[in-house]
C-alpha cells in the first residue's frame, strides 16, 4: 500500500512535489545536437495607445518574427547561476553568453549569429545561427548545470531524471533569495554535510520467477515521460493567452 512504480528503489517516495516548496537544487542536464529545436520569437508587439498624437497618427507597428535554435531545460524560473559547457569547454557568462531574467528582457532582434542567450524565466538557451550550425554540424555535446529555488506542486522531482544535489539545508540564501558564491563562482555552503547528492542511475526491480529467470516489475518515469511534457503544456498556455491578448487589442482598437 502507498507504493509507487515510477521512482526506482525509492518506492515509498512520490514522483512529484506534493505542494509548493522552496527547495533548492543544483541540477545537471546533458544534451546532444539532436536536442536543439526551433522556436520563433517576436518583436514589435502592439501597444494600444490611450490617445492619438496628431503629429504621428499612424500607430501601427510591424510584428517581426525571429527563428532560432534552442535547448530547453527541465525547469524554468531558474536562478542566474547557470553554467554551459560545449564539448567539455565551459563557457563564460557575460562573455560567451548573456543571461536575461525574463522573456521581456530578451530582444531576439539583437541576437547576432555568433551570440548565445540564456533566459531564466523560460529556462532556455537560444543560439545564434552560426553557433547552432557549429553544434549541429560537429555533433557537439552540451552540459548545463544550474540552480533552481522553488518548485510548484506537481513539478517532477529532479532526482528521478537528472544528476542533482538537494542543497536546501546546506546553503543560506542571500537577501535576494540567491545562492551565495565565492570569487571563483563556486557555491558557498553553510553546512556541506547537509548536501544530498543524487546520482541518477537505472533502478530496475526484478523478481526471480524461475531458475535463472528474472522479470522487471517496475517502470521508471524517465522511460515513459520526461519533464518536457509539463513545459510543453506551459508553452501552449502561453501561446493561447497571447492569442487572446491579441484579439483583445483588436477589439480595443475598433472601439
Regions from the PLM with identified roles:
Residues 1-255:
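S/T-rich, low-complexity, solvent-exposed segments of bacterial secretion/appendage proteins
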Amino acid at each position: 500500500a502507498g507504493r509507487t512504480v515510477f521512482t526506482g528503489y525509492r518506492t515509498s517516495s512520490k514522483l512529484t512535489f506534493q505542494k509548493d516548496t522552496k527547495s533548492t537544487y543544483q541540477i545537471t542536464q546533458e544534451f546532444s545536437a539532436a536536442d536543439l529545436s526551433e522556436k520563433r520569437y517576436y518583436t514589435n508587439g502592439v501597444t494600444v495607445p490611450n490617445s492619438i498624437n496628431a503629429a504621428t497618427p499612424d500607430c501601427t507597428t510591424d510584428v517581426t518574427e525571429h527563428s532560432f535554435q534552442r535547448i530547453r531545460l527541465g525547469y524554468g524560473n531558474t536562478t542566474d547561476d547557470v553554467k554551459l559547457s560545449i564539448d567539455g569547454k565551459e563557457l563564460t557568462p557575460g562573455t560567451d553568453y548573456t543571461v536575461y531574467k525574463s522573456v521581456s528582457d530578451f530582444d531576439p532582434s539583437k541576437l547576432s549569429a555568433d551570440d548565445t542567450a540564456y533566459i531564466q524565466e523560460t529556462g532556455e538557451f537560444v543560439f545564434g545561427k552560426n553557433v547552432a550550425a557549429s553544434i549541429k554540424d560537429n555533433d557537439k555535446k552540451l552540459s548545463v548545470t544550474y540552480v533552481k529555488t522553488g518548485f510548484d506542486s506537481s513539478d517532477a522531482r529532479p532526482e528521478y531524471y537528472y544528476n542533482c544535489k538537494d542543497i536546501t539545508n546546506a546553503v543560506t540564501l542571500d537577501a535576494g533569495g540567491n545562492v551565495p558564491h565565492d570569487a571563483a563562482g563556486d557555491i558557498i555552503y553553510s553546512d556541506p554535510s547537509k548536501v544530498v547528492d543524487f546520482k541518477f542511475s537505472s533502478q530496475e526491480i526484478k523478481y526471480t520467477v524461475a531458475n535463472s529467470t528474472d522479470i522487471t516489475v517496475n517502470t521508471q518515469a524517465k522511460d515513459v515521460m520526461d519533464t518536457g511534457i509539463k513545459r510543453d503544456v506551459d508553452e501552449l498556455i502561453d501561446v493561447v493567452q497571447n492569442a487572446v491578448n491579441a484579439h483583445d487589442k483588436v477589439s480595443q482598437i475598433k472601439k
